[in-house]
Protein backbone atom coordinates (compact mmCIF):
# COMPACT_ATOMS: atom_id res chain seq x y z
CA UNK A 1 0.00 0.00 0.00
CA UNK A 2 2.93 2.40 0.64
CA UNK A 3 4.37 4.14 -2.41
CA UNK A 4 8.11 4.77 -2.47
CA UNK A 5 9.74 7.81 -4.04
CA UNK A 6 13.46 7.67 -4.62
CA UNK A 7 15.27 11.04 -4.46
CA UNK A 8 18.77 11.63 -5.87
CA UNK A 9 20.86 14.79 -5.85
CA UNK A 10 19.57 17.66 -7.95
CA UNK A 11 22.50 17.47 -10.36
CA UNK A 12 21.38 14.03 -11.43
CA UNK A 13 17.84 15.21 -11.92
CA UNK A 14 19.12 18.03 -14.05
CA UNK A 15 21.18 15.60 -16.07
CA UNK A 16 18.02 13.71 -16.85
CA UNK A 17 16.39 16.75 -18.40
CA UNK A 18 15.67 16.34 -22.05
CA UNK A 19 15.79 12.57 -22.01
CA UNK A 20 13.00 10.68 -23.68
CA UNK A 21 10.37 8.90 -21.69
CA UNK A 22 11.99 5.59 -22.40
CA UNK A 23 15.47 6.70 -21.35
CA UNK A 24 16.88 5.21 -18.17
CA UNK A 25 18.89 7.15 -15.62
CA UNK A 26 21.55 5.14 -13.84
CA UNK A 27 22.56 6.30 -10.38
CA UNK A 28 26.35 6.10 -10.12
CA UNK A 29 27.78 3.98 -7.31
CA UNK A 30 28.33 5.88 -4.09
CA UNK A 31 25.72 8.54 -4.81
CA UNK A 32 23.40 8.77 -1.76
CA UNK A 33 19.81 7.77 -2.34
CA UNK A 34 17.02 8.85 0.01
CA UNK A 35 13.88 6.76 0.35
CA UNK A 36 10.67 8.64 1.18
CA UNK A 37 7.56 6.72 2.19
CA UNK A 38 4.32 8.42 1.23
CA UNK A 39 0.88 7.61 2.55
CA UNK A 40 -1.50 5.90 0.15
CA UNK A 41 -4.09 8.23 -1.37
CA UNK A 42 -7.74 7.44 -1.96
CA UNK A 43 -9.85 9.00 -4.69
CA UNK A 44 -13.61 8.74 -4.22
CA UNK A 45 -16.58 9.95 -6.23
CA UNK A 46 -18.83 11.88 -3.86
CA UNK A 47 -22.39 12.87 -4.70
CA UNK A 48 -23.44 16.31 -3.51
CA UNK A 49 -26.15 18.88 -4.17
CA UNK A 50 -24.13 20.18 -7.13
CA UNK A 51 -23.56 16.77 -8.63
CA UNK A 52 -20.75 14.25 -8.34
CA UNK A 53 -17.20 15.37 -7.63
CA UNK A 54 -13.93 13.66 -6.86
CA UNK A 55 -12.53 13.76 -3.34
CA UNK A 56 -8.96 12.81 -2.54
CA UNK A 57 -7.57 12.09 0.91
CA UNK A 58 -4.83 10.11 2.55
CA UNK A 59 -4.69 8.23 5.83
CA UNK A 60 -3.09 11.14 7.71
CA UNK A 61 -5.85 13.54 6.71
CA UNK A 62 -8.53 11.04 7.70
CA UNK A 63 -6.88 10.34 11.06
CA UNK A 64 -6.51 14.04 11.85
CA UNK A 65 -10.11 14.73 10.86
CA UNK A 66 -11.37 11.96 13.14
CA UNK A 67 -9.24 13.23 16.01
CA UNK A 68 -10.58 16.75 15.59
CA UNK A 69 -14.16 15.42 15.71
CA UNK A 70 -13.40 13.44 18.87
CA UNK A 71 -11.79 16.45 20.56
CA UNK A 72 -14.80 18.57 19.58
CA UNK A 73 -17.09 16.03 21.29
CA UNK A 74 -18.65 14.81 18.05
CA UNK A 75 -18.30 11.09 18.77
CA UNK A 76 -20.62 9.82 16.02
CA UNK A 77 -18.66 11.65 13.32
CA UNK A 78 -15.36 10.55 14.84
CA UNK A 79 -16.49 6.91 14.96
CA UNK A 80 -17.50 7.09 11.28
CA UNK A 81 -14.10 8.45 10.26
CA UNK A 82 -12.13 5.94 12.34
CA UNK A 83 -14.19 3.10 10.85
CA UNK A 84 -13.50 4.45 7.36
CA UNK A 85 -9.79 4.60 8.12
CA UNK A 86 -9.70 1.01 9.38
CA UNK A 87 -11.62 -0.19 6.33
CA UNK A 88 -9.78 1.71 3.59
CA UNK A 89 -6.31 1.77 5.18
CA UNK A 90 -6.27 -1.50 7.14
CA UNK A 91 -2.54 -1.74 7.83
CA UNK A 92 -0.84 1.58 8.52
CA UNK A 93 0.99 3.25 11.37
CA UNK A 94 -2.39 4.70 12.42
CA UNK A 95 -4.20 1.37 12.84
CA UNK A 96 -3.54 0.95 16.55
CA UNK A 97 -4.48 4.54 17.36
CA UNK A 98 -7.61 4.32 15.20
CA UNK A 99 -8.75 1.23 17.09
CA UNK A 100 -8.27 2.89 20.48
CA UNK A 101 -9.72 6.25 19.55
CA UNK A 102 -12.55 4.56 17.68
CA UNK A 103 -13.37 2.75 20.90
CA UNK A 104 -13.46 6.08 22.72
CA UNK A 105 -15.77 7.48 20.05
CA UNK A 106 -18.19 4.58 20.47
CA UNK A 107 -18.09 5.14 24.23
CA UNK A 108 -19.22 8.66 23.44
CA UNK A 109 -22.23 7.34 21.53
CA UNK A 110 -22.87 4.78 24.30
CA UNK A 111 -22.44 1.88 21.88
CA UNK A 112 -20.60 -0.10 24.51
CA UNK A 113 -20.39 -3.45 22.73
CA UNK A 114 -18.90 -1.88 19.61
CA UNK A 115 -16.42 0.03 21.76
CA UNK A 116 -15.45 -3.22 23.49
CA UNK A 117 -14.84 -4.87 20.10
CA UNK A 118 -12.41 -2.08 19.11
CA UNK A 119 -10.49 -2.32 22.38
CA UNK A 120 -10.40 -6.13 22.26
CA UNK A 121 -8.94 -6.09 18.76
CA UNK A 122 -6.27 -3.62 19.84
CA UNK A 123 -5.39 -5.71 22.90
CA UNK A 124 -5.14 -8.86 20.77
CA UNK A 125 -3.16 -7.40 17.86
CA UNK A 126 -0.85 -5.16 19.93
CA UNK A 127 -0.59 -7.14 23.15
CA UNK A 128 2.88 -5.86 24.02
CA UNK A 129 2.07 -2.16 23.73
CA UNK A 130 1.18 0.12 26.62
CA UNK A 131 -2.01 0.99 24.76
CA UNK A 132 -3.16 -2.61 25.18
CA UNK A 133 -3.17 -2.02 28.93
CA UNK A 134 -5.30 1.10 28.55
CA UNK A 135 -7.60 -0.81 26.21
CA UNK A 136 -8.15 -3.45 28.90
CA UNK A 137 -9.13 -0.76 31.39
CA UNK A 138 -11.61 0.62 28.87
CA UNK A 139 -13.09 -2.84 28.31
CA UNK A 140 -13.75 -3.25 32.03
CA UNK A 141 -15.28 0.22 32.20
CA UNK A 142 -17.55 -0.47 29.22
CA UNK A 143 -18.86 -3.68 30.77
CA UNK A 144 -19.68 -1.67 33.87
CA UNK A 145 -21.52 0.93 31.81
CA UNK A 146 -23.59 -1.93 30.44
CA UNK A 147 -24.36 -3.08 33.99
CA UNK A 148 -22.43 -6.30 33.36
CA UNK A 149 -20.79 -6.18 36.77
CA UNK A 150 -19.55 -9.82 36.87
CA UNK A 151 -17.59 -9.41 33.62
CA UNK A 152 -16.34 -6.00 34.70
CA UNK A 153 -15.02 -7.44 37.97
CA UNK A 154 -13.38 -10.32 36.09
CA UNK A 155 -11.76 -7.96 33.60
CA UNK A 156 -10.15 -5.89 36.33
CA UNK A 157 -8.99 -9.05 38.09
CA UNK A 158 -7.22 -10.01 34.85
CA UNK A 159 -5.69 -6.55 34.59
CA UNK A 160 -4.24 -6.93 38.09
CA UNK A 161 -2.25 -9.94 36.83
CA UNK A 162 -0.31 -7.73 34.39
CA UNK A 163 3.35 -7.02 35.17
CA UNK A 164 3.42 -3.52 33.70
CA UNK A 165 1.10 -1.75 36.16
CA UNK A 166 2.26 1.32 38.05
CA UNK A 167 0.82 2.44 41.39
CA UNK A 168 -2.00 4.44 39.81
CA UNK A 169 -2.93 1.50 37.60
CA UNK A 170 -3.11 -0.93 40.51
CA UNK A 171 -5.24 1.30 42.71
CA UNK A 172 -7.56 2.11 39.81
CA UNK A 173 -7.95 -1.57 38.91
CA UNK A 174 -8.59 -2.58 42.53
CA UNK A 175 -10.99 0.33 42.98
CA UNK A 176 -12.96 -0.52 39.84
CA UNK A 177 -13.01 -4.22 40.69
CA UNK A 178 -14.26 -3.48 44.20
CA UNK A 179 -16.85 -1.09 42.79
CA UNK A 180 -18.21 -3.85 40.53
CA UNK A 181 -18.39 -6.22 43.50
CA UNK A 182 -20.15 -3.53 45.52
CA UNK A 183 -22.74 -3.14 42.77
CA UNK A 184 -23.29 -6.91 42.92
CA UNK A 185 -24.11 -6.47 46.65
CA UNK A 186 -21.18 -8.74 47.51
CA UNK A 187 -20.18 -6.44 50.33
CA UNK A 188 -17.75 -8.80 52.04
CA UNK A 189 -15.75 -9.42 48.86
CA UNK A 190 -15.84 -5.74 47.89
CA UNK A 191 -14.60 -4.79 51.35
CA UNK A 192 -11.62 -7.15 51.02
CA UNK A 193 -10.78 -5.71 47.61
CA UNK A 194 -10.93 -2.12 48.86
CA UNK A 195 -8.88 -3.00 51.94
CA UNK A 196 -6.25 -4.59 49.68
CA UNK A 197 -6.02 -1.32 47.78
CA UNK A 198 -5.47 0.64 51.02
CA UNK A 199 -2.86 -1.87 52.17
CA UNK A 200 -1.05 -1.56 48.84
CA UNK A 201 -1.17 2.24 48.93
CA UNK A 202 0.25 2.33 52.46
CA UNK A 203 3.07 0.04 51.35
CA UNK A 204 4.21 2.37 48.53
CA UNK A 205 3.13 5.80 49.85
CA UNK A 206 6.64 6.74 51.01
CA UNK A 207 8.22 5.77 47.67
CA UNK A 208 5.69 6.63 44.95
CA UNK A 209 3.43 9.58 44.38
CA UNK A 210 0.06 9.02 42.75
CA UNK A 211 -0.80 11.11 39.70
CA UNK A 212 -4.45 11.26 40.82
CA UNK A 213 -6.07 10.75 44.22
CA UNK A 214 -9.44 10.03 42.62
CA UNK A 215 -9.36 6.24 42.85
CA UNK A 216 -7.86 6.30 46.32
CA UNK A 217 -10.82 8.49 47.27
CA UNK A 218 -13.20 6.04 45.58
CA UNK A 219 -11.74 3.17 47.61
CA UNK A 220 -11.98 5.00 50.94
CA UNK A 221 -15.46 6.28 50.21
CA UNK A 222 -16.79 2.82 49.51
CA UNK A 223 -15.14 1.48 52.63
CA UNK A 224 -17.57 3.91 54.27
CA UNK A 225 -20.48 2.93 52.03
CA UNK A 226 -20.21 -0.74 53.03
CA UNK A 227 -20.88 -0.25 56.77
CA UNK A 228 -23.41 2.43 55.77
CA UNK A 229 -25.31 -0.21 53.76
CA UNK A 230 -25.12 -2.61 56.69
CA UNK A 231 -26.31 0.16 59.02
CA UNK A 232 -29.38 0.72 56.84
CA UNK A 233 -30.18 -2.98 56.84
CA UNK A 234 -30.27 -3.37 60.65
CA UNK A 235 -33.91 -3.24 61.87
CA UNK A 236 -35.08 -1.99 65.26
CA UNK A 237 -37.33 -4.70 66.71
CA UNK A 238 -39.36 -5.44 69.77
CA UNK A 239 -39.20 -6.63 72.51
CA UNK A 240 -37.20 -3.98 74.33
CA UNK A 241 -34.19 -6.24 74.92
CA UNK A 242 -33.92 -7.01 71.20
CA UNK A 243 -34.28 -3.33 70.34
CA UNK A 244 -31.37 -2.53 72.63
CA UNK A 245 -29.19 -5.03 70.76
CA UNK A 246 -30.28 -3.62 67.40
CA UNK A 247 -29.55 -0.06 68.52
CA UNK A 248 -26.02 -1.05 69.56
CA UNK A 249 -25.45 -2.71 66.18
CA UNK A 250 -26.64 0.37 64.29
CA UNK A 251 -24.55 2.71 66.44
CA UNK A 252 -21.43 0.58 65.88
CA UNK A 253 -21.95 0.56 62.12
CA UNK A 254 -22.68 4.30 62.08
CA UNK A 255 -19.33 5.00 63.74
CA UNK A 256 -17.52 2.60 61.40
CA UNK A 257 -18.98 4.31 58.33
CA UNK A 258 -18.30 7.78 59.74
CA UNK A 259 -14.67 6.86 60.40
CA UNK A 260 -14.12 5.84 56.77
CA UNK A 261 -15.90 8.92 55.43
CA UNK A 262 -13.64 11.11 57.57
CA UNK A 263 -10.59 9.26 56.19
CA UNK A 264 -11.92 9.97 52.70
CA UNK A 265 -12.14 13.69 53.46
CA UNK A 266 -8.52 13.63 54.67
CA UNK A 267 -7.34 12.41 51.25
CA UNK A 268 -8.19 15.86 49.93
CA UNK A 269 -10.05 15.07 46.72
CA UNK A 270 -12.77 17.78 46.68
CA UNK A 271 -15.43 15.64 44.99
CA UNK A 272 -15.09 12.64 47.30
CA UNK A 273 -14.77 14.96 50.30
CA UNK A 274 -18.08 16.59 49.34
CA UNK A 275 -19.76 13.19 48.98
CA UNK A 276 -18.38 11.98 52.31
CA UNK A 277 -19.45 15.09 54.20
CA UNK A 278 -22.96 14.66 52.88
CA UNK A 279 -23.05 10.98 53.85
CA UNK A 280 -21.92 11.65 57.43
CA UNK A 281 -24.84 14.02 57.86
CA UNK A 282 -27.13 11.42 56.29
CA UNK A 283 -26.01 8.79 58.80
CA UNK A 284 -27.34 10.78 61.75
CA UNK A 285 -30.55 11.73 59.97
CA UNK A 286 -31.15 8.08 59.00
CA UNK A 287 -30.52 6.98 62.60
CA UNK A 288 -33.12 9.51 63.74
CA UNK A 289 -35.61 8.19 61.18
CA UNK A 290 -35.00 4.63 62.36
CA UNK A 291 -36.12 5.57 65.88
CA UNK A 292 -39.17 7.46 64.61
CA UNK A 293 -40.29 4.49 62.50
CA UNK A 294 -39.41 1.81 65.03
CA UNK A 295 -42.27 -0.36 66.33
CA UNK A 296 -43.93 0.92 69.53
CA UNK A 297 -45.12 -1.04 72.57
CA UNK A 298 -48.47 -2.75 72.14
CA UNK A 299 -50.04 -0.78 75.00
CA UNK A 300 -49.73 2.40 72.90
CA UNK A 301 -51.74 1.03 69.98
CA UNK A 302 -55.36 1.79 69.23
CA UNK A 303 -57.45 4.96 69.06
CA UNK A 304 -58.01 4.90 72.82
CA UNK A 305 -54.27 5.39 73.36
CA UNK A 306 -53.71 8.20 70.88
CA UNK A 307 -52.90 10.76 73.56
CA UNK A 308 -50.39 8.41 75.21
CA UNK A 309 -48.86 7.76 71.81
CA UNK A 310 -48.42 11.47 71.12
CA UNK A 311 -46.70 11.92 74.47
CA UNK A 312 -44.45 8.94 73.65
CA UNK A 313 -43.35 10.44 70.33
CA UNK A 314 -42.85 13.87 71.86
CA UNK A 315 -40.52 12.44 74.50
CA UNK A 316 -38.77 10.28 71.91
CA UNK A 317 -38.06 13.31 69.73
CA UNK A 318 -36.61 15.19 72.68
CA UNK A 319 -34.24 12.31 73.43
CA UNK A 320 -33.04 11.82 69.87
CA UNK A 321 -32.99 15.51 68.89
CA UNK A 322 -29.22 15.39 69.28
CA UNK A 323 -29.03 13.22 66.14
CA UNK A 324 -30.63 15.95 64.05
CA UNK A 325 -28.35 18.53 65.63
CA UNK A 326 -25.30 16.45 64.69
CA UNK A 327 -26.62 16.06 61.14
CA UNK A 328 -27.23 19.81 60.88
CA UNK A 329 -23.70 20.65 62.08
CA UNK A 330 -22.19 18.15 59.66
CA UNK A 331 -23.99 19.57 56.63
CA UNK A 332 -23.07 23.09 57.75
CA UNK A 333 -19.39 22.12 58.02
CA UNK A 334 -19.58 20.39 54.64
CA UNK A 335 -21.03 23.49 53.00
CA UNK A 336 -18.35 25.69 54.56
CA UNK A 337 -15.64 23.31 53.33
CA UNK A 338 -17.06 23.27 49.81
CA UNK A 339 -17.32 27.06 49.76
CA UNK A 340 -13.71 27.32 50.87
CA UNK A 341 -12.62 24.89 48.13
CA UNK A 342 -14.80 26.53 45.50
CA UNK A 343 -16.63 23.28 44.77
CA UNK A 344 -19.92 23.55 42.88
CA UNK A 345 -21.51 20.13 42.43
CA UNK A 346 -24.56 18.02 43.21
CA UNK A 347 -23.23 17.08 46.64
CA UNK A 348 -23.17 20.74 47.60
CA UNK A 349 -26.78 21.09 46.40
CA UNK A 350 -27.82 18.00 48.36
CA UNK A 351 -26.17 19.29 51.53
CA UNK A 352 -27.96 22.64 51.12
CA UNK A 353 -31.32 20.88 50.81
CA UNK A 354 -30.59 18.63 53.78
CA UNK A 355 -29.47 21.62 55.87
CA UNK A 356 -32.71 23.49 55.14
CA UNK A 357 -34.80 20.40 55.95
CA UNK A 358 -33.02 19.87 59.28
CA UNK A 359 -33.51 23.50 60.22
CA UNK A 360 -37.26 23.01 59.78
CA UNK A 361 -37.26 19.80 61.83
CA UNK A 362 -35.38 21.51 64.67
CA UNK A 363 -37.69 24.53 64.71
CA UNK A 364 -39.78 24.28 67.93
CA UNK A 365 -42.86 25.45 66.01
CA UNK A 366 -42.55 22.65 63.43
CA UNK A 367 -45.64 20.40 63.34
CA UNK A 368 -44.59 16.75 63.24
CA UNK A 369 -46.62 14.00 61.67
CA UNK A 370 -46.85 11.07 64.05
CA UNK A 371 -45.59 7.69 62.91
CA UNK A 372 -48.07 5.09 61.79
CA UNK A 373 -48.88 2.98 64.89
CA UNK A 374 -49.55 -0.04 62.67
CA UNK A 375 -45.79 -0.43 62.29
CA UNK A 376 -45.61 -1.82 65.82
CA UNK A 377 -44.04 -5.25 65.82
CA UNK A 378 -42.65 -4.88 62.29
CA UNK A 379 -39.14 -4.23 61.17
CA UNK A 380 -37.93 -0.67 60.72
CA UNK A 381 -38.41 0.40 57.11
CA UNK A 382 -35.07 0.94 55.43
CA UNK A 383 -35.03 4.17 53.41
CA UNK A 384 -33.60 3.78 49.93
CA UNK A 385 -29.97 4.87 49.86
CA UNK A 386 -29.08 7.90 47.78
CA UNK A 387 -27.09 7.19 44.65
CA UNK A 388 -23.28 7.37 45.09
CA UNK A 389 -20.57 8.63 42.69
CA UNK A 390 -19.23 6.14 40.08
CA UNK A 391 -15.88 5.72 38.30
CA UNK A 392 -15.70 7.49 34.92
CA UNK A 393 -15.71 5.34 31.80
CA UNK A 394 -12.62 7.15 30.56
CA UNK A 395 -9.37 6.63 32.39
CA UNK A 396 -8.92 9.74 34.51
CA UNK A 397 -10.02 11.19 37.80
CA UNK A 398 -13.34 13.01 37.92
CA UNK A 399 -16.67 11.62 39.12
CA UNK A 400 -19.33 11.20 36.49
CA UNK A 401 -22.78 12.71 36.43
CA UNK A 402 -25.36 11.26 38.78
CA UNK A 403 -27.21 8.43 37.16
CA UNK A 404 -29.58 5.74 38.36
CA UNK A 405 -28.93 2.87 38.32
CA UNK A 406 -25.22 3.49 38.87
CA UNK A 407 -23.10 2.74 35.86
CA UNK A 408 -19.44 2.13 35.62
CA UNK A 409 -18.50 5.62 36.09
CA UNK A 410 -17.34 7.17 39.72
CA UNK A 411 -19.10 8.30 44.51
CA UNK A 412 -23.49 8.06 43.81
CA UNK A 413 -26.42 9.91 45.62
CA UNK A 414 -23.56 9.75 43.64
CA UNK A 415 -23.47 12.87 41.73
CA UNK A 416 -20.55 14.74 40.45
CA UNK A 417 -19.16 16.60 37.46
CA UNK A 418 -18.69 14.85 34.15
CA UNK A 419 -15.23 13.50 33.36
CA UNK A 420 -12.97 15.49 31.08
CA UNK A 421 -12.18 14.39 27.52
CA UNK A 422 -10.65 10.96 27.20
CA UNK A 423 -7.02 10.65 26.19
CA UNK A 424 -6.60 10.02 22.48
CA UNK A 425 -3.65 8.28 20.91
CA UNK A 426 -2.13 10.95 18.70
Name every feature range the model reports, one short phrase each:
Residues 1-14:
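Sec-dependent bacterial lipoprotein signal peptides
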Residues 16-426:
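Acidic, polar-rich low-complexity tracts and alpha-helical solenoid repeat scaffolds
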